[in-house]
Amino acid sequence: MQHELAQTIPELILWTKEREFSLSLSSDRLAFLLAIALYNNERTDGELLESDLQDIFRHVSNAFEQSEATQTQRANNAINDLVKQRFLNRFSSEFTEGLAIYRLTPLGVGVSEYYIRQREFSTLRLSIQLSIVADEIQRASNAAEEGGDERFWRNQVFAPLKFSVAEIFDSIDLSQRMMDENQQQIRERIAMLLSQNWHEAIATCQQLLDETSGNLRELQDVLNASGDKLQSQLLRIQSCLIGRDDLDFVDQLIVNLQNKLDRIISWGQQAIDLWIGYDRHVHKFIRTAIDMDKNRVFGQRLRQSIQDYFESPWQLYIAKAEPLLDLRDDETELNEAEAVGELPTELEYESLTQVQEQIIATMQAHLAPFREQGKPIDLGAILREQLAMYPLSRHFDVARIIVDQAVKLGMASQDSQAIYPEWQSINDNGAEVQANVIDQYNK
């Protein structure tokens, strides 16, 4: 009876220690390895001569603007380094007269594949992968229902699930992680655009947001369409294992595949939700920037566009909502005195304008020193401090005025970096605020 190989963490650590594995690839070394892999894919024999590697290194050296005087020596060092780190295997014998033959190792193929191929993740590729998985699982489930001895299960069920389905799941998982990295790069690019020239970058940012959101949704639709069918086929195989204690290794594999599939689908949806949150955060930042701009930039752009209209014509689109039907009856207007009656002195109306003017004057006097001294404004702390001085009935108006006055003074640098602030309690009745510290003041 064969036993499924299993490695524990201590075994893997010992295995790595015994073989003295060590990886270190600078940018030029990595570029050299990727160039070798790409060149190797175009060859039918998969073998490389040292002269081939020298030529490839010359292209890399020129791209990195390195000295030509030491090119041969640096090429030899780079080749030896890749051999030492087990990215390349070197073969030589007395028949080759000192001319070595090189082949990429599995590690070299894996690293280069990661950088070159995994970026080709697309809906078409995902559909093909899931189609292959569905066929393999279908054949395995049919074989499981036929039944047989342990050898039959290993060859007809375990083998295709282990060496085809599981590897494709791992490939999809790796592709998702590549998309995570791509999203992070897009976030950094958007942050850079908004911090440099946000009013010119709005269209570019919107395009990046829409493209990424569309790609995530399209890929998730493909996963959702296939996920339930794949899970049902795995359950079908699992039902055939009832009462077969000798097939525990197959049952464990099925559980692992179910977990992988659940993780892939779950993370795909979670990635969409996180991106939607980021999308809203960027739009909130842009709206805040527009509100604080006081129409200076957009006014200048509009005037310039009108002046240059004949040289660069443009179109103006106007969106107008349909007017709502007025259902009120003007003839049945109520007399205020009849409808309300006479109010007690305690309930007499106090002009909201007067209240607002008093609060605005107080807040301006309170916030001005922060700008003059360059101190950051923590809205959460200020709101807690000020609301404690007012009755609960005025908390909303006071909080709104404080926020309006604060954002007129400046903005938070963390907003442009898409950093989500924590919710802070601002009174004893459950009111909370979410705001980064304002640390950049308008000139």
UniProtKB/Swiss-Prot annotation:
Query: Which keywords has UniProt assigned to this entry?
Result: Calcium, Cell cycle, Cell division, Chromosome partition, Cytoplasm, DNA condensation
Q: What HAMAP family would the database entry show? A: MukF (MF_01803)
Record's Pfam families? KicB, MukF_C, MukF_M
Q: What is the lineage of its organism?
A: Bacteria, Pseudomonadati, Pseudomonadota, Gammaproteobacteria, Pasteurellales
Query: Which regions form coiled coils?
Result: none
Q: What is this protein called?
A: Chromosome partition protein MukF
A GO MF label: calcium ion binding
NCBIfam families documented for this protein: PRK05260.1
Q: Which organism is it from?
A: Glaesserella parasuis serovar 5 (strain SH0165)
